[in-house]
């Protein structure tokens, strides 16, 4: 039956056991707390290839879900039963009922089972044009996984019990050329014996001082250092640049982030300069760019923020994870810079309660970019990566780019944003920002479960709407943001007058009577918000004049700071090319041939196993 292909497989068996020939998987992550379920993946043109390695001799389930639950999910189930490989495309309805998909869009490439593990490799198109499949884009994806010790029977897969979970990942973040790190000097930003509380989520902050260098260095790569066994505990790591006006006393201890008693020094650490998220191998700068260290304007103090995810609420965990920063004196052509763009973090950023969808916009105005770039880099700067940032109510973020009233291609987007998964997105092509351009960070929120106003602020229950742009060459511009006018927001709820001069914060309402002597926060909460009122308020806020924030290093200001600007008149919005769906084609011949090889390989593996090989 197998003939000469069996001889080919015999020759290729050592390579095939490690994966199908010619396939590489630049990304990998362990999905379960016990290290039993590993996911590997990589992009191949308009397809995405996956490899699952799971400690089971039954079925392996994998899929994508809009919320991380089983409802309305796109699922594939595969394995090896009685020496034969199988892979089946399923979906679930809103009631979590599993149904076989009439359009089978997942293609099995390789399968293997031994006495302990099942390995399957498969691929699918990014956009299958199947209403029961999820399109795979640059946005965050909620991956769901499951396994069982039995293969499916005639009635389908058995219930997986507790052998299941979910994880947010960005599957299409393009990989960059690796840097050989073994010969590079490095320093570590690592926590020391942090006790992890037995609660679901903990954010731990620790300040560090960057080593003192006698000459300029470039950071060219950052890698995670995750304590062994904690691969599923450490969820993401952010590094913020802090004020340089400190002494080393701020380094004495760490503290829980966003806590009322955290050190005041933490509040000066506002700009994200490094980031890592679970599933990432680290961050590598482009070969012509590096993050400068050792010079007067470079970071001296930084804040390490580590998000610990402990859903099982395990007790007694002690962690010493962090980041390894590789640097070199072989200076690259350009210094990297970071610009924070979006909404200035303040109480003037307001979101009503009970809203299934509410939009906020933060403007990096043409006036700020005209002054800062016009003075420092008239030919423009080049963006190569972006980190999008909101808090728990955030559901989607887009960084839009305008030039002379025409919208350019999106700089970055995440339409399925997850606060618990943040990393820099590499741009597939660098994009140039010129003097006089506009940037808008557009955030979409959901406050259906909230009974009071949501305010801009540092707490995770407060909100932000920010983009961090990695670019070159570095200019003296660290923040390009805006604040909407608060008085016009208050006029919407009927406020007529406040007490002046303003001597208290939040300031106090004078009239009308129903708000008299209330703070503006209390007045906004007293207003009876309905969905209709919320939509009208949203329309108003997006049209308001904004106060320009245009900052240099260490909070120095460009002259445009504090001036009022009008949101841009968008004459021509960007229109992406529509996705054209055609009738699904038949599986390629090489796919059928591959499955024959798979069957032969499994028979051969069974023969070898029976002979003790």
Curated annotation (Swiss-Prot):
GO MF annotations, alphabetized: copper ion binding; dopamine beta-monooxygenase activity
Q: Catalytic residues per the record?
A: 203, 389
EC class, as a word, reads oxidoreductase
**Where is the protein found, in the record's own terms?**
Endoplasmic reticulum membrane
Any single Pfam family the record assigns to this protein: DOMON
Q: Does the keyword Glycoprotein apply?
A: yes
Residues listed as glycosylation sites in the UniProt record: 114, 247, 476, 517
What's the Enzyme Commission number for this chain?
1.14.17.-
Question: What Gene3D superfamilies does the record point to?
Answer: 2.60.120.230, Copper type II, ascorbate-dependent monooxygenase, N-terminal domain
Residues recorded as binding Cu cation B, renumbered to this chain, are: 389, 391, 464
SMART domains linked to this entry: DoH
Q: What GO CC annotations are associated with the protein?
A: endoplasmic reticulum membrane
What tissues has this protein been observed in?
Broadly exprressed, with highest levels in salivary gland and ovary.
- CDD domains with a match to the protein in the record: DOMON_DOH
Where in this chain does the record put each DOMON domain? 35-148
**Cofactor(s) for this UniProt protein:** Cu(2+)
Residue intervals on the Lumenal side: 20-587
Which residues does the annotation say bind Cu cation A? Answer: 235-236, 307
| Maturation and modification | N-glycosylated.
Q: Which UniProt keywords apply?
A: Copper, Disulfide bond, Endoplasmic reticulum, Glycoprotein, Membrane, Metal-binding, Monooxygenase, Oxidoreductase, Signal, Transmembrane, Transmembrane helix
The record's cofactor note says:
Binds 2 copper ions per subunit.
Q: Which family does it belong to?
A: Belongs to the copper type II ascorbate-dependent monooxygenase family.
Q: What is this protein called?
A: DBH-like monooxygenase protein 1
- Species of provenance: Mus musculus
């Amino acid at each position: 039956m197998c003939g000469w292909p069996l001889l080919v497989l015999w020759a290729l068996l050592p390579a095939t056991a490690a994966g199908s020939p010619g396939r590489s998987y630049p990304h990998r992550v362990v999905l379960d707390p016990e290290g039993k379920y590993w996911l590997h993946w990589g992009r191949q043109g308009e397809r995405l290839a996956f490899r699952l390695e799971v400690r089971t001799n039954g079925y392996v389930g994998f899929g994508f879900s809009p919320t991380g639950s089983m409802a309305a999910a796109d699922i594939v189930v595969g394995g090896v039963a009685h020496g034969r490989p199988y892979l089946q495309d399923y979906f679930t309805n809103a009631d979590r009922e599993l149904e076989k998909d009439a359009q089978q869009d997942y293609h099995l490439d390789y399968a293997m089972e031994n006495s302990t593990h099942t390995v399957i490799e498969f691929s699918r198109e990014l956009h299958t044009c199947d209403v029961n499949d999820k399109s795979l884009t640059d946005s965050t994806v909620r991956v769901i996984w499951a396994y069982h010790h039995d293969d499916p029977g005639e009635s389908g897969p058995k219930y997986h019990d507790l052998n299941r979970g979910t994880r947010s990942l960005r599957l299409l973040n393009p990989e960059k050329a690796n840097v050989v790190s073994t010969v590079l000097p490095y320093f570590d930003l690592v926590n020391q014996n942090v006790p992890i509380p037995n609660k679901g989520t903990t954010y731990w902050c620790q300040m560090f001082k960057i080593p003192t260098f006698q000459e300029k260095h470039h950071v060219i790569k950052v890698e995670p250092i995750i304590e062994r066994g904690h691969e599923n505990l450490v969820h993401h790591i952010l590094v913020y640049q802090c004020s340089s006006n400190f002494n080393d006393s701020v380094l004495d201890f760490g503290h829980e982030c966003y806590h009322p008693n955290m050190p005041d020094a933490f509040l000066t650490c506002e700009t994200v300069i490094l980031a890592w998220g679970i599933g990432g191998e680290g961050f590598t700068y482009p070969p012509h760019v590096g993050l400068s260290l050792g010079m007067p304007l470079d970071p001296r103090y930084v804040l390490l923020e580590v998000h610990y995810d402990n859903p099982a609420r395990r007790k007694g965990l002690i962690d010493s994870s962090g980041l390894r920063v590789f640097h070199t004196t072989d200076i690259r052509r350009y210094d990297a810079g970071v610009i924070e763009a979006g909404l200035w973090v303040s109480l003037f950023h307001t979101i009503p309660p009970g809203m299934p969808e509410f939009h906020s916009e933060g403007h990096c105005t043409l006036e700020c970019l005209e002054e800062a770039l016009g003075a420092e880099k008239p030919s423009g700067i080049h963006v190569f990566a972006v980190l999008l940032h909101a808090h728990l109510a955030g559901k989607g973020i887009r960084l839009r780019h305008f030039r002379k009233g025409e919208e350019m291609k999106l700089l970055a987007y995440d339409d399925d944003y997850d606060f618990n998964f943040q990393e820099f997105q590499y741009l597939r092509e660098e994009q140039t920002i010129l003097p006089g351009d506009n940037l808008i960070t557009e955030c979409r929120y959901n406050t259906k479960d909230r009974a009071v106003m949501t305010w801009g602020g540092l707490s995770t229950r407060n909100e932000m709407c920010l983009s961090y742009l990695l670019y070159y060459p570095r200019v003296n511009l660290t923040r390009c943001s805006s604040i909407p006018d608060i008085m016009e927001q208050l006029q919407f709820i009927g406020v007529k007058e406040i007490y002046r001069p303003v001597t208290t914060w939040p300031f106090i309402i004078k009239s009308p009577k129903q708000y008299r002597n209330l703070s503006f926060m209390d007045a906004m909460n007293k207003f009876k918000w309905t969905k209709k009122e919320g939509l009208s308020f949203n329309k108003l806020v997006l049209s308001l004049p904004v106060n320009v924030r245009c900052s240099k290093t260490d909070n120095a200001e460009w002259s445009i700071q504090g001036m009022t600007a009008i949101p841009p008149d968008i004459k021509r919005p960007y229109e992406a090319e529509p996705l054209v769906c055609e009738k699904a084609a038949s599986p390629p011949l090489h796919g059928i041939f591959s499955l024959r090889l798979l069957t032969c390989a499994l028979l051969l593996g069974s023969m070898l196993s029976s002979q003790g090989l």
